[in-house]
Amino acid sequence: MAKQEYKQLPKRSEVHSTTEQFKDTVKTSLGLDLFKGLGLTIKEFFSPSVTIHYPMEQLPLSPRYRAVHHLQRLLDSGSERCIGCGLCEKICTSNCIRIITHKGEDNRKKIDSYTINLGRCIYCGLCAEVCPELAIVMGNRFENASTQRSQYGSKSEFLTSEQDAKNCSHAEFLGFGAVSPNYNERMQATPLDYVQELSKEESKEETPTSPESHKGDENV
């Protein structure tokens, strides 16, 4: 551990007479310390302002910002992406997602109710990561104040407009929960991939020769 060296400041002499007190006051008031403080104040006064006058002004948010959720639709058709698998409900650490489904005539799940309790949600984004259909994503709407509790968490609050999906006025989501454009290049092989490659090589080596090759050997 480095040795710390302390510098002892000279002890200030005590002032007794009125004349000495007056001189000390003038020296302290008009000394360099006063001008140093004023210099810093003047420097910050003329520096560019960094204050944002919210809500009239807002800073641009990152595409991967995690705020109120969006339920996506398929482009062109406008159909809902959600297939009712319930993975988002299972992985939710806050236990704030509720999905009620039933089996339709085509033996596929139909969604009766999809709610998110925004009062409990911690906006971790796990639901967006686990969704196989990219149906639920994290949006950038953080202004969700309301006077009525019933306005929090309804499906109509999160679902993308069907008209916007059919007109392709909104692009595929590129924020938190979306697939990266270069995910193939960034994907790394897992230990299971190496095991599969070894099993394929072993199966090729153990493949028996065809009967025709044995006949050819006998003729020779």
Curated annotation (Swiss-Prot):
The keyword RNA-binding does not apply. It catalyses: a quinone + NADH + 5 H(+)(in) = a quinol + NAD(+) + 4 H(+)(out). Its cofactor is [4Fe-4S] cluster. Its main location: membrane. SUPFAM superfamilies: 4Fe-4S ferredoxins. GO terms for cellular component: plasma membrane. Residues 190-220 are annotated as: Disordered. Residues 71-102, 112-141 form the 4Fe-4S ferredoxin-type domain. It is a peripheral membrane protein. Keywords: 4Fe-4S, Cell inner membrane, Cell membrane, Iron, Iron-sulfur, Membrane, Metal-binding, NAD, Quinone, Repeat, Translocase, Ubiquinone. InterPro entries: 4Fe4S_Fe-S-bd, 4Fe4S_Fe_S_CS, NADH_quinone_OxRdtase_chainI. GO terms for molecular function: 4 iron, 4 sulfur cluster binding; iron ion binding; NADH:ubiquinone reductase (non-electrogenic) activity; quinone binding. GO terms for biological process: aerobic respiration. It is found in: Cell inner membrane. [4Fe-4S] cluster 2 binds at residues 92, 121, 124, 127. NDH-1 shuttles electrons from NADH, via FMN and iron-sulfur (Fe-S) centers, to quinones in the respiratory chain. The immediate electron acceptor for the enzyme in this species is believed to be ubiquinone. Couples the redox reaction to proton translocation (for every two electrons transferred, four hydrogen ions are translocated across the cytoplasmic membrane), and thus conserves the redox energy in a proton gradient. Belongs to the complex I 23 kDa subunit family. HAMAP family: NDH1_NuoI. This is NADH-quinone oxidoreductase subunit I.
